[in-house]
Regions:
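Glycine-rich flexible loops
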Residues: 1-198
Length: 198
Protein backbone atom coordinates (compact mmCIF):
# COMPACT_ATOMS: atom_id res chain seq x y z
CA UNK A 1 0.00 0.00 0.00
CA UNK A 2 2.93 2.36 0.53
CA UNK A 3 3.24 2.65 -3.28
CA UNK A 4 -0.48 2.82 -4.05
CA UNK A 5 -0.42 6.49 -5.05
CA UNK A 6 2.40 5.98 -7.55
CA UNK A 7 1.85 2.45 -8.89
CA UNK A 8 -1.04 0.20 -9.84
CA UNK A 9 -1.16 -2.25 -6.92
CA UNK A 10 -4.18 -4.24 -8.09
CA UNK A 11 -3.81 -7.80 -9.36
CA UNK A 12 -6.24 -8.50 -12.24
CA UNK A 13 -7.68 -12.02 -11.92
CA UNK A 14 -10.04 -14.16 -13.92
CA UNK A 15 -13.25 -13.82 -11.87
CA UNK A 16 -14.53 -17.24 -12.90
CA UNK A 17 -11.25 -18.82 -11.74
CA UNK A 18 -11.74 -17.12 -8.36
CA UNK A 19 -15.36 -18.35 -8.15
CA UNK A 20 -14.12 -21.87 -8.95
CA UNK A 21 -11.67 -21.59 -6.03
CA UNK A 22 -14.59 -20.64 -3.78
CA UNK A 23 -16.51 -23.74 -4.89
CA UNK A 24 -13.42 -25.85 -4.14
CA UNK A 25 -13.10 -24.05 -0.76
CA UNK A 26 -9.52 -23.03 -1.53
CA UNK A 27 -8.23 -19.96 0.26
CA UNK A 28 -4.99 -19.59 -1.70
CA UNK A 29 -5.67 -17.73 -4.94
CA UNK A 30 -2.08 -18.00 -6.09
CA UNK A 31 -3.04 -20.41 -8.86
CA UNK A 32 -6.11 -18.46 -10.00
CA UNK A 33 -5.40 -17.07 -13.43
CA UNK A 34 -3.67 -13.69 -13.28
CA UNK A 35 -4.75 -11.82 -16.39
CA UNK A 36 -1.61 -9.76 -17.00
CA UNK A 37 1.80 -11.42 -16.69
CA UNK A 38 3.67 -8.41 -15.28
CA UNK A 39 1.50 -8.62 -12.14
CA UNK A 40 2.84 -12.06 -11.19
CA UNK A 41 4.87 -10.65 -8.28
CA UNK A 42 1.72 -9.28 -6.58
CA UNK A 43 -0.57 -11.49 -4.50
CA UNK A 44 -4.36 -11.08 -4.50
CA UNK A 45 -5.94 -9.75 -1.32
CA UNK A 46 -7.26 -12.27 1.22
CA UNK A 47 -10.68 -10.70 0.64
CA UNK A 48 -10.69 -11.17 -3.15
CA UNK A 49 -13.08 -14.12 -2.81
CA UNK A 50 -15.59 -11.95 -0.94
CA UNK A 51 -15.43 -9.25 -3.63
CA UNK A 52 -15.85 -11.85 -6.39
CA UNK A 53 -19.21 -12.95 -4.96
CA UNK A 54 -20.74 -9.55 -5.71
CA UNK A 55 -22.38 -9.17 -9.13
CA UNK A 56 -21.10 -5.62 -9.65
CA UNK A 57 -18.46 -4.58 -12.15
CA UNK A 58 -16.78 -2.36 -9.53
CA UNK A 59 -16.35 -3.31 -5.87
CA UNK A 60 -14.72 -1.14 -3.19
CA UNK A 61 -13.77 -2.29 0.30
CA UNK A 62 -13.19 0.34 2.98
CA UNK A 63 -12.49 0.37 6.69
CA UNK A 64 -14.53 3.51 7.18
CA UNK A 65 -14.33 4.97 10.68
CA UNK A 66 -17.97 6.08 10.44
CA UNK A 67 -19.15 2.60 9.45
CA UNK A 68 -16.97 0.83 12.01
CA UNK A 69 -18.24 3.14 14.77
CA UNK A 70 -21.64 1.49 14.22
CA UNK A 71 -20.40 -1.98 13.21
CA UNK A 72 -18.89 -2.55 16.68
CA UNK A 73 -22.15 -1.90 18.55
CA UNK A 74 -24.25 -4.77 19.93
CA UNK A 75 -27.45 -3.31 18.47
CA UNK A 76 -25.83 -2.06 15.26
CA UNK A 77 -28.11 -3.94 12.87
CA UNK A 78 -31.23 -2.25 14.26
CA UNK A 79 -29.59 1.19 14.20
CA UNK A 80 -28.30 0.70 10.66
CA UNK A 81 -31.73 -0.49 9.47
CA UNK A 82 -33.02 2.94 10.41
CA UNK A 83 -30.09 4.97 9.08
CA UNK A 84 -29.65 3.15 5.76
CA UNK A 85 -33.31 3.01 4.65
CA UNK A 86 -33.57 3.05 0.87
CA UNK A 87 -30.11 1.56 0.35
CA UNK A 88 -29.85 -2.12 -0.59
CA UNK A 89 -27.57 -3.29 2.19
CA UNK A 90 -26.74 -6.47 4.09
CA UNK A 91 -25.51 -6.92 7.67
CA UNK A 92 -22.95 -9.71 8.17
CA UNK A 93 -22.00 -10.86 11.69
CA UNK A 94 -18.29 -11.13 12.46
CA UNK A 95 -16.43 -14.01 10.82
CA UNK A 96 -12.69 -14.20 10.17
CA UNK A 97 -11.85 -12.54 6.82
CA UNK A 98 -10.83 -14.78 3.95
CA UNK A 99 -12.43 -18.12 3.15
CA UNK A 100 -14.57 -18.39 6.35
CA UNK A 101 -16.27 -15.06 5.56
CA UNK A 102 -16.61 -15.95 1.88
CA UNK A 103 -18.20 -19.33 2.73
CA UNK A 104 -20.78 -17.61 4.92
CA UNK A 105 -21.61 -15.04 2.22
CA UNK A 106 -21.72 -17.71 -0.47
CA UNK A 107 -24.64 -19.29 1.41
CA UNK A 108 -26.47 -15.94 1.38
CA UNK A 109 -27.66 -14.28 -1.83
CA UNK A 110 -25.39 -11.23 -1.85
CA UNK A 111 -26.23 -10.35 -5.47
CA UNK A 112 -29.23 -8.29 -4.35
CA UNK A 113 -27.12 -5.89 -2.26
CA UNK A 114 -25.01 -2.87 -3.14
CA UNK A 115 -23.62 -2.47 0.38
CA UNK A 116 -22.33 -5.18 2.73
CA UNK A 117 -21.50 -4.09 6.27
CA UNK A 118 -19.15 -6.47 8.05
CA UNK A 119 -19.42 -6.47 11.85
CA UNK A 120 -16.26 -5.21 13.57
CA UNK A 121 -14.58 -4.74 10.19
CA UNK A 122 -15.83 -2.36 7.51
CA UNK A 123 -17.93 -2.00 4.39
CA UNK A 124 -17.97 -3.42 0.86
CA UNK A 125 -19.77 -1.42 -1.85
CA UNK A 126 -20.58 -2.50 -5.39
CA UNK A 127 -21.76 -0.63 -8.47
CA UNK A 128 -21.79 -0.80 -12.24
CA UNK A 129 -19.51 2.25 -12.52
CA UNK A 130 -16.81 3.81 -10.35
CA UNK A 131 -19.02 6.86 -10.01
CA UNK A 132 -21.93 4.76 -8.73
CA UNK A 133 -19.71 3.14 -6.09
CA UNK A 134 -18.47 6.56 -4.97
CA UNK A 135 -22.01 7.94 -4.84
CA UNK A 136 -23.26 5.03 -2.70
CA UNK A 137 -20.20 5.32 -0.45
CA UNK A 138 -20.87 9.06 0.03
CA UNK A 139 -24.49 8.30 0.93
CA UNK A 140 -23.41 5.74 3.54
CA UNK A 141 -20.75 8.07 4.96
CA UNK A 142 -23.17 11.01 5.14
CA UNK A 143 -25.84 8.99 6.92
CA UNK A 144 -23.38 7.46 9.40
CA UNK A 145 -21.23 10.54 9.99
CA UNK A 146 -20.66 11.20 13.68
CA UNK A 147 -19.89 14.55 15.30
CA UNK A 148 -16.24 15.20 16.13
CA UNK A 149 -15.39 14.92 19.82
CA UNK A 150 -13.02 17.21 21.69
CA UNK A 151 -11.87 20.79 21.46
CA UNK A 152 -8.19 21.57 21.04
CA UNK A 153 -7.22 25.15 21.87
CA UNK A 154 -4.46 26.99 20.05
CA UNK A 155 -2.81 27.95 23.37
CA UNK A 156 -2.38 24.27 24.23
CA UNK A 157 -0.80 23.65 20.85
CA UNK A 158 1.81 26.33 21.49
CA UNK A 159 2.75 24.57 24.74
CA UNK A 160 3.25 21.32 22.84
CA UNK A 161 5.36 23.09 20.23
CA UNK A 162 7.71 24.34 22.95
CA UNK A 163 8.00 20.79 24.35
CA UNK A 164 9.06 19.23 21.04
CA UNK A 165 11.23 22.16 19.97
CA UNK A 166 14.49 20.48 20.98
CA UNK A 167 13.44 16.95 19.96
CA UNK A 168 13.43 15.10 16.66
CA UNK A 169 9.64 14.86 16.78
CA UNK A 170 7.10 16.84 14.80
CA UNK A 171 3.60 17.62 15.95
CA UNK A 172 0.71 16.21 13.90
CA UNK A 173 -0.55 18.70 11.35
CA UNK A 174 -4.24 18.60 12.30
CA UNK A 175 -5.59 19.87 15.61
CA UNK A 176 -8.12 17.03 15.65
CA UNK A 177 -5.28 14.55 16.18
CA UNK A 178 -4.37 16.28 19.44
CA UNK A 179 -8.01 16.20 20.53
CA UNK A 180 -8.12 12.42 20.09
CA UNK A 181 -5.05 11.99 22.29
CA UNK A 182 -6.59 14.10 25.06
CA UNK A 183 -10.11 12.67 25.12
CA UNK A 184 -10.64 10.82 28.43
CA UNK A 185 -13.39 8.56 27.05
CA UNK A 186 -11.32 7.54 24.02
CA UNK A 187 -8.26 6.90 26.20
CA UNK A 188 -10.36 4.64 28.43
CA UNK A 189 -11.70 2.70 25.42
CA UNK A 190 -8.30 2.25 23.78
CA UNK A 191 -6.84 1.06 27.08
CA UNK A 192 -9.16 -1.95 27.22
CA UNK A 193 -9.25 -4.00 24.01
CA UNK A 194 -9.16 -3.65 20.26
CA UNK A 195 -12.69 -2.91 19.07
CA UNK A 196 -12.25 -4.53 15.69
CA UNK A 197 -9.76 -7.40 15.38
CA UNK A 198 -9.15 -7.39 11.63
Amino acid sequence: LSEALNKNIFTPLDRQAVLDKIDQEEEDLGSAQILEKHYHSLRPSIETTLHALMRHRFVAHAHSVNVISYAVLKDSKAILNEKLKGIKWLWVPYVRPGLPLTKMLNKMDVSDYDVIILANHGVVIGGDTKEEVLDIFKQVETRLCRPVRGNFLETEKSKLESLVDSLDYKLPKHDLTHSLARDDLLLEIIGKNALYPD
